[in-house]
Amino acid sequence: MRSHYCGDLRASHDGETVELCGWVSRRRDHGGVIFLDLRDRNGLVQVVFDPDTVDAFALADKVRSEYVVRLSGRVRMRDESVRNNKMATGDIEVLGKELTILNEAETPPFELDAHSAAGEEVRLKYRYMDLRRPDVLKNFQFRSRLTHVVRAFLEGEGFMDVETPILTRATPEGARDYLVPSRTHPGSFFALPQSPQLFKQLLMVAGFDRYYQIAKCFRDEDLRADRQPEFTQIDLEASFVEEEDIMGITERMVRSVFKELLSVDLPDFPRMPFSEAMQRFGSDKPDLRIALELIDIADLLAGVDFKVFSGPANDPKGRVAAMRVPGGCSLSRKDIDGYTKFVSIYGAKGLAYIKVNDLAAGAEGLQSPILKFLTEDAIKGILERTGAETGDLIFFGADKAKIVNEALGALRVKVGHDLNLVEGEWAPLWVVDFPMFEEDEGQYHALHHPFTMPSCSAEELKSNPGEALSRAYDMVLNGTELGGGSIRIHSPAMQRTVFEALGISDEEAEEKFGFLLDGLKYGAPPHGGLAFGLDRMVMLMTGCESIRDVIAFPKTQTAACTMTNAPSPVDNKQLREVGVQVRKEEG
């Protein structure tokens, strides 16, 4: 039906007759001449109809925004005075000769330009219209190019693209599963996979050596901002590898993606132990573009009478930390109150601070409600250890270590952006040496997942599980976890030891993971892998603010689709066929 895409026409096509199809982006009537801006996937071109082409002119007079048309005409150069440098096709226009209206369109529910003020709710309800907007469309063109580069790279590294099941069995991987009732096995359920983890490990047992997949994953998580119940991973696994092998392959892959799509040469990927990341930045995914750091000062405050500080300072599970903000004296009382409210989200009971108005003036040059509770030596020690200078502000966190890390870690990022303290565009790193487990109310939980190989022997793991480190590694970029992976357990005995540390009995392990344990008995090779969040990678690289901007048909923050009204009730006949009865909520 067409010879060219609208957005592909250039001065080199001058004089050619072309056939175009697309949507009418705008119609203008200028003194008896009608101009149509015709849009397709590749861009926009101006088409001119004059009264000499009687039939086509009459139809052009009828068309309105978003009508679908087909036309033919001759490409010609625009007069220099009316050329549009803001359009890729701005040097030329098409003199229309024939026009066919393929479909009419109602008035769109919102403007389809980049400056549309439409809210997200209406945009998601009419998502197919929202996707017509050029600034939205370009995100998906970028995403398509990214997956193409990834596939080409991994194929070149000897990885095979293998699809794993979508209907599988429920296995505890951290979040709740989406369950699918089986009609042919009444009372039994499939689960949608949270990841291809166990299947890709079994592909290594099968001898596939190198596997990858652009995999759809599902997690029925509690509602959180910018999380999606279904998301896409770049998933890979390889046999006969150690950490350096997987990290090397994936680092080269990410470098290749950035080079080909953004013409960016990423800086070095430093390695940082988990413990150092938490100590310095309060986060296991620190944004290294922000120079602010958390500095331990518990030893300086353990003896003060101020229990807010001395309590956590003397608590083995507590932490007292300071964060120096260069130029922070400019923050107003209102600003500080706002930050105090912000850290309360993370459980902090308050936010102490000291303003260093004049370092040379000693105590007279400091401003803070807490100065009266601190000794002269403590104040001097804090100023020296933080490297405070005139004009700086020091924030403090004192509580359980988890609360201090989360509160000051989040505050560090917020203050860094608010005060324009972000330096550089890209700051990647590897976080390594993660704890094997985290403890909650006396129960151990896998920090990553229970199939991660520990760095120690089975005997050492049994004797001191709380101190065990794992052979896990996370790739972090600008404070976002791009991907996480590990060397996996390939020994049935070690796998049972880890299950035991997690409180999973032999019976439960056999019932839930028997197929994996069986597979490990038949010559499982050493293997490891990593999974990247494709959606987040695209979001970061395109500069989008929300992950929903890079998913074609995303769910809302309440895990619903306003376009299709999913999830929705189903009729009783369908429920009976799968043996499900819906319990009505009481009250």
Swiss-Prot record:
One of its GO terms (molecular function) is aspartate-tRNA(Asn) ligase activity. L-aspartate binds at residues 173, 219, 448, 488. It is found in: Cytoplasm. The keyword Methyltransferase does not apply. The keyword ATP-binding applies. It is an enzyme of class 6 (ligase). PANTHER family: ASPARTATE--TRNA LIGASE, MITOCHONDRIAL (PTHR22594:SF5), ASPARTYL/LYSYL-TRNA SYNTHETASE (PTHR22594). HAMAP family: Asp_tRNA_synth_type1 (MF_00044). This is Aspartate--tRNA(Asp/Asn) ligase. It comes from Alcanivorax borkumensis (strain ATCC 700651 / DSM 11573 / NCIMB 13689 / SK2). The lineage of its organism: Bacteria, Pseudomonadati, Pseudomonadota, Gammaproteobacteria, Oceanospirillales. The gene is aspS.
